[in-house]
């Protein structure tokens, strides 16, 4: 496991994302859960983002902590997410986590898939 707490992090998450994760963890009453962000093949642009809660941190996973919650990324996904930021939005179009990814050359209209 690689844990970063300094300023130069390969991926970060916003206060809004951390606050939402914390609220969801409080609902679940399971402090062992972490937000896992991953990239899989698919979507209309070639790759898509995935978000899930996970209790495990595997060997090689990258973790970053904010507001007492952890974000976890596997090494393969981290290659596509370098320099990115996980955020959370809630509005008329619904609520969702999303990734601001500087590596994405194209994204789909909903922002859930991308290409590099």
Curated annotation (Swiss-Prot):
GO terms for molecular function: 2 iron, 2 sulfur cluster binding; 4 iron, 4 sulfur cluster binding; iron ion binding. Its cofactor is iron-sulfur cluster. GO terms for biological process: iron-sulfur cluster assembly. Homodimer. PANTHER family: IRON-SULFUR CLUSTER ASSEMBLY 2 HOMOLOG, MITOCHONDRIAL. The gene is erpA. Keywords: Iron, Iron-sulfur, Metal-binding. Required for insertion of 4Fe-4S clusters for at least IspG. It comes from the Bacteria. This is Iron-sulfur cluster insertion protein ErpA. Iron-sulfur cluster binds at residues 44, 108, 110. SUPFAM superfamilies: HesB-like domain. InterPro entries: FeS_biogenesis, FeS_cluster_insertion, FeS_cluster_insertion_CS, FeS_cluster_insertion_RrpA, HesB-like_dom_sf. Pfam families: Fe-S_biosyn (PF01521). Binds 1 iron-sulfur cluster per subunit. Belongs to the HesB/IscA family. GO terms for cellular component: cytosol.
């Amino acid at each position: 496991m690689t844990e970063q707490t300094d300023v130069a992090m390969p991926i970060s998450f916003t206060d809004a994302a951390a606050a939402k994760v914390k609220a969801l963890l409080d609902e679940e009453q399971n402090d062992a859960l972490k937000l896992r962000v991953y990239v899989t093949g698919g979507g209309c642009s070639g790759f898509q983002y995935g978000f899930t809660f996970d209790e495990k941190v595997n060997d090689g996973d990258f973790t970053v902590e904010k507001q007492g919650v952890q974000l976890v990324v596997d090494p393969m996904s981290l290659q596509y997410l370098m320099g990115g930021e996980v955020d959370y939005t809630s509005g008329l179009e619904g609520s969702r986590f999303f990734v601001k990814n500087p590596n994405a050359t194209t994204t789909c209209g909903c922002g859930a898939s991308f290409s590099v």
